[in-house]
UniProtKB/Swiss-Prot annotation:
UniProt protein name: Sulfur carrier protein FdhD
Entry's localization field: Cytoplasm
HAMAP family, per the entry: FdhD
Claim: Iron-sulfur is one of the keywords in the record: no
UniProt-listed InterPro entries: Cytidine_deaminase-like, FdhD
Entry superkingdom: Bacteria
Broad class of where this protein is predominantly found: cytoplasm
Gene: fdhD
SUPFAM superfamilies per record: Cytidine deaminase-like (SSF53927)
Residues spanning the signal sequence: none
Organism: Shigella dysenteriae serotype 1 (strain Sd197)
Keyword Cytoplasm: yes
């Protein structure tokens, strides 16, 4: 295929994070067709000129990702600790250049780690097993949630995945009100990145983590639990299962963890006292 033709194919869709490419179906290997594929790019988070981490992510809402990652990793305590942020292209991907306060940057340098880039991986590159896991203050018990309201939210979670609807290749994370209404959500090829985008956006907008819960389309790994708890989320619903370490972390930090969420079904792993039906 000529380069000009390939360029035209790539520009067919106007949805950020999607490209059309030429491919072949099993039942017709002689005739290529066009189909949508989710973009995945290396994204480097650069704090005060020093690259801290490279993650594979969808190339949209990266400011929210950077803010959410900074909060959920304990690099900052609030959005006020970031003085400026720019997303710029680099030779192999994108950079989010973040200007931290001096105090926060000094703290980052003291415990800096290098992460290897894998899709949404929250463990890659830690130097010792003891470095896995961060101290999280036990969460308060300030709210309850009616599980009967979960079904409607599950039916609308896909509304926050325009790329996923075209490609079947993204995860979603959304904020769910006690009524079951989803009032904000993000998608990404990496489940941790999708969650960071949600955490970053709500924090930037000054929204409270009270009176609601996080709903994710993926499994619940320990990183998902820890990121949620670091930002003050008390209840985490996951469409798929939870891991043993996720359950242990949730139990320890008082987070209510619910998996296998389907209409009419849910498995409560920890702290059911926040739930009713």
């Amino acid at each position: 295929m000529k380069k000009t033709q390939q360029k035209e194919i790539e520009n067919v869709t106007n949805i950020t994070g999607v490209r059309q490419i030429e491919l072949w179906r099993r039942d017709d290997l002689q005739h290529p067709r066009l189909d949508e594929v989710a973009e995945e790019v290396p994204v480097a988070l650069v704090y005060n000129g020093i690259s801290h981490v490279v993650m594979m992510a969808s190339p949209k809402d990266l400011e929210y990702f950077a803010l959410g990652f900074s909060l959920s990793e304990g690099i900052i305590e609030s959005p006020r600790d970031i003085f400026g942020m720019d997303v710029v292209p680099s030779c192999n991907g994108l950079e989010v250049q973040i200007e931290l306060s001096s105090r926060r940057f000094m703290g980052l340098k003291e415990r800096r780690r290098a992460l290897a880039g894998r899709t949404g991986c929250g463990v890659c590159g830690v130097e010792q097993l003891n470095d896995i896991g961060k101290p999280v203050q036990p969460l308060p018990f300030t709210q309850t949630f009616d599980l009967n309201k979960l079904d409607d939210a599950l039916r609308h979670l896909n509304d926050f995945q325009p790329v996923g609807q075209l490609t079947s290749c993204t995860h979603a994370a959304a904020w769910m009100l006690p009524s079951g209404e989803l009032v904000g959500g993000h998608e990404d090829v990496g489940r941790h990145v999708a969650l960071d985008k949600l955490l970053g956006r709500r924090s930037q907008e000054g929204e409270s983590w009270q009176q609601g819960a996080v709903l994710v389309s993926s499994r619940a790994s320990y990183e998902m639990v820890q990121k949620s708890a670091m930002c003050g989320v008390e209840i985490l619903f996951a469409v798929s299962a939870a891991t043993t370490l996720a359950v242990e972390v949730a139990e320890r930090c008082n987070l209510t963890l619910v998996g296998f969420c389907k209409p009419g079904r849910a498995t409560v792993y920890t702290h059911p006292q926040r739930l009713s039906n």
